[in-house]
Amino acid sequence: MALICIGSVCFSLFHIGVIILLIINYFSSHIKKIFPSFFKNPNKEEIDKHIGNILEAKRKNKQLEQSIYIELKNTGSLNQVFSSTQNSSIVIKFGAVWCKPCNKIKEYFKNQLNYYYVTLVDIDVDIHPKLNDQHNIKALPTFEFYFNLNNEWVLVHTVEGANQNDIEKAFQKYCLEKAK
């Protein structure tokens, strides 16, 4: 067994490897932000182009959808929202009552109903801790943009934080805009 000793303390290479993997896992989101070109999904551009084509076709054919805002309550199910919506886009906001940026951005989020045909879902992570864990939410608020591609809901974009410019760009890219 290979060991690395520092003074009177020795570590096996296996343990050092595990520690390095834990450190990389912990800092992975920061590393992805610093070096985004190394972590690009090669299909992301194709998916974005396909979504753009679908939205453009809906605009031309005037296939208008509905705008819905849902605040997921204790008994609410996110799966039920996905199965029942007629929209091609769903945007989920993960937040909390105690989160000031979440409360500040809430009206902006709701007002998107005036500009886009979209299903908006507001989830309080304190009421739905399982959803928080399932979606691996690390920051509040977090916005997840889903698009229905070939009858399958695909997570196409995530915005962490309350930056309205980033959120607006995602709405423009992944949601059907209402006529002005």
Curated annotation (Swiss-Prot):
Gene3D superfamilies: Glutaredoxin. It is a single-pass type II membrane protein. Belongs to the thioredoxin family. It holds the Pfam family Thioredoxin. Its main location: endoplasmic reticulum. GO terms for cellular component: endoplasmic reticulum; endoplasmic reticulum membrane. Keywords: Disulfide bond, Electron transport, Endoplasmic reticulum, Membrane, Redox-active center, Signal-anchor, Transmembrane, Transmembrane helix, Transport. It is found in: Endoplasmic reticulum membrane. The chain crosses the membrane at residues 4-24. The disulfide bond between Cys-99 and Cys-102 acts as a redox-active center and is reduced by thioredoxin reductase TRXR. It comes from the Eukaryota. Residues 1-3 are cytoplasmic. Participates in various redox reactions through the reversible oxidation of its active center dithiol to a disulfide and catalyzes dithiol-disulfide exchange reactions. The active site is at 99 (nucleophile), 102 (nucleophile). It comes from Plasmodium falciparum (isolate 3D7). InterPro entries: Thioredoxin-like_sf, Thioredoxin_domain. This is Thioredoxin 3. Residues 25-180 are lumenal. Disulfide bonds join 99-102. Residues 29-176 form the Thioredoxin domain.
